[in-house]
Regions:
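Conserved ABC ATPase signature
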Residues: 130-134
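Catalytic Walker B motif of ABC-type/P-loop ATPase nucleotide-binding domains
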Residues: 155-159
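Conserved ABC transporter NBD signature motif
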Residues: 62-73, 77-78
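ABC ATPase "signature
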Residues: 214-215
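Conserved catalytic motifs of ABC-family nucleotide-binding domains
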Residues: 151
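Conserved ABC ATPase "signature" region
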Residues: 102, 106, 111-126
Length: 254
């Protein structure tokens, strides 16, 4: 359940790289318990914005606040209360899943049961499997599990379903929804519009380092239709994703 109390606050964030403005005065708030999406083409500024919020990159000006903590003033405190699932992970192929989770927990000095963490993402039965033997979807689940070892206040997901087939993508969606239902605040980036509609309470559309739209997915679609916009193709009640899922089954194959 979301509340109006913001857990993420961005105020006039700016970041310049020589003659390129990556982030140009971005401001927004993310409510506690909300799933907030950032949409935009490559180079739009969404990744830089996320990195500033995570404390991985300094803004030239503006403020980034996570759970009341100014990121620039105390990045260590911020990193202790966030979980970060990266788009690409460098896990050791020969390590077992429980070993990987335990390793990351030690980095946070978190006292956890690796199997319990794996159970949150449905991988407890694979605790002794080696990373190299996982499917693409299972590797994404593990990367999310690792981001949960410190019981984060905010979970950052960077394109969590990139490269996955429709079956695996739906499984990751179900996992994100489950984490959200347990009260976590989630901020994610994605290139999949259907993913944003499925997961996000609100989305910000970014272009050239600026937010050009911010609302719920339904409201953004309604606003577009009110302009008289007509889709080029007839809108169908099903998609090719649905055809694929119907033919092959919804369960992720190992």
């Amino acid at each position: 359940m979301t509340t109006v109390n913001p857990v993420i606050v961005a105020k006039e964030l700016r970041k310049q790289y020589e003659d390129i403005t990556a982030v140009d005065g971005i401001s927004f708030e993310v409510r506690r318990g909300e799933v907030f999406g950032m949409l935009g083409p490559n180079g739009a500024g969404k990744t830089t914005t996320i990195e500033i919020l995570e404390g991985m990159r300094d803004a030239d000006s503006g403020q980034a606040i996570i759970n009341g903590i100014n990121v620039k003033d105390d990045p260590t405190a911020v990193k202790a209360i966030i979980g970060v699932q990266l788009q690409q992970n460098a896990f050791f192929d020969n390590l077992k899943l429980a070993e990987i989770v335990d390793l990351y927990a030690r980095l946070y000095k978190a006292k956890i049961d690796p199997v319990e963490i794996l159970s949150r993402v449905g991988l407890e039965s694979r605790k002794n499997a080696r990373y190299a033997h996982l499917s693409g979807g299972q590797k994404q689940w593990l990367s999310i599990a690792v981001a949960l070892v410190n019981d984060p206040v905010v979970l950052f997901l960077d394109e969590p379903t990139t490269g996955l087939d429709p079956q695996a993508r739906r499984q990751v969606w179900a996992l994100v929804n489950k984490i959200s239902e347990n009260g976590a605040t989630i901020m994610l980036t994605t290139h999949y519009m259907e993913e944003a509609e499925e997961l996000c309470d609100r989305v910000a559309v970014i272009e050239d380092g600026q937010i050009i739209a911010l609302d719920t997915p339904d409201n953004l679609i309604d606003q577009l239709l009110e302009t008289g916009f007509k889709p080029e193709k007839r809108v169908r009640e099903a998609t090719l994703d649905d055809v694929f899922l119907n033919l092959t089954g919804r369960d992720l194959r190992d």
